[in-house]
Amino acid sequence: MAKLSSINKNERRKKLVEKYAAKYAALKATADDQSLDETERLIARLKMAELPRNANPTRVRNRCNTTGRPRGYYRKFGLCRIELRDLANKGLIPGVTKSSW
């Protein structure tokens, strides 16, 4: 199990990303728009820099839903590899079977 403080920190980041998502997307679109002149794009980049650091979606870490483990994460299931294997062997994940050939 991951440290509870790490899990909570990641949850706070998710909330911040959600809060600033629309503003961040609008500023990013303005900053990346090649048809605008350089000063407008620079102003948009400076406004993006004023947003909280944790409002950037790249700072959110995918974590296992059951253990909070940050590594070996399978997006399709929302689980780490260890929990995925454990639950699949117990038959608790519908449609997942052991491979045999």
UniProtKB/Swiss-Prot annotation:
SUPFAM superfamilies attached to this UniProt entry: Glucocorticoid receptor-like (DNA-binding domain)
Assembly: Part of the 30S ribosomal subunit. Contacts proteins S3 and S10.
One example of a Gene Ontology biological process annotation: translation
Gene3D superfamilies xrefs: 1.10.287.1480
Entry function: Binds 16S rRNA, required for the assembly of 30S particles and may also be responsible for determining the conformation of the 16S rRNA at the A site.
Family: Belongs to the universal ribosomal protein uS14 family.
Gene of this entry: rpsN
GO cellular component, one term: cytoplasm
Protein source organism: Novosphingobium aromaticivorans (strain ATCC 700278 / DSM 12444 / CCUG 56034 / CIP 105152 / NBRC 16084 / F199)
GO function terms (MF aspect): rRNA binding; structural constituent of ribosome
Protein name: Small ribosomal subunit protein uS14
Keyword list, A-Z: Ribonucleoprotein, Ribosomal protein, RNA-binding, rRNA-binding
PANTHER family, A to Z: 30S RIBOSOMAL PROTEIN S14, SMALL RIBOSOMAL SUBUNIT PROTEIN US14M
Keyword check for RNA-binding: yes
PROSITE patterns for the chain: RIBOSOMAL_S14 (PS00527)
Statement: the UniProt record of this protein carries the keyword RNA-binding: yes
